[in-house]
């Protein structure tokens, strides 16, 4: 089978948008015993306020995606879980154009599933 050379990836992705910053995020689909999935609504004052999303947040320097989720779930929802309860599910990669209030960036999000945690979100 012949090998086909692909164009190398550059900072200009998707629709050719220049990317100034890469944002690494981890998020989780929390699924309870009844099969319900918890979604969070983005707060006023943040980009894309009012939209719904999976809980999670930015991965800090030196932090694994799992550690970021454990930290974010504790900070945002007051629940605790372990890395062994986080199952990788998928990822998303998307470029966002600059707006009047935010510079262009590329989001790379790792998505996990979690069915076991302590506390009530």
Regions found by a protein language model. Give the residues of each.
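Structural motif
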Residues: 37, 49, 86, 106-111
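Active-site-adjacent beta-strand/loop module that shapes the phosphate/pyrophosphate-binding cleft
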Residues: 23, 32, 90-121
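N-terminal acidic, proline/glycine-rich, low-complexity intrinsically disordered segments
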Residues: 1-5
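Short, solvent-exposed loop/helix junctions and linker helices
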Residues: 31, 59-63, 67, 102, ...
């Amino acid at each position: 089978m012949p090998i086909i050379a692909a164009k190398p990836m550059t900072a200009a992705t998707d629709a050719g948008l220049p990317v100034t910053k890469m944002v690494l995020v981890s998020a989780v689909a929390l699924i309870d015993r009844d099969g319900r999935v918890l979604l969070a609504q983005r707060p006023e004052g943040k980009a894309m306020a009012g939209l719904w999303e999976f809980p999670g947040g930015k991965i800090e320097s030196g932090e694994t995606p799992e550690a970021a989720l454990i930290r974010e779930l504790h900070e945002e929802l007051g629940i605790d879980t372990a890395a062994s309860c986080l199952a990788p599910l998928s990822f998303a990669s998307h470029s966002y154009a600059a707006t009047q209030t935010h510079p262009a960036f590329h989001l790379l999000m790792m998505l996990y599933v979690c069915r076991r945690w302590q506390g009530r979100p």
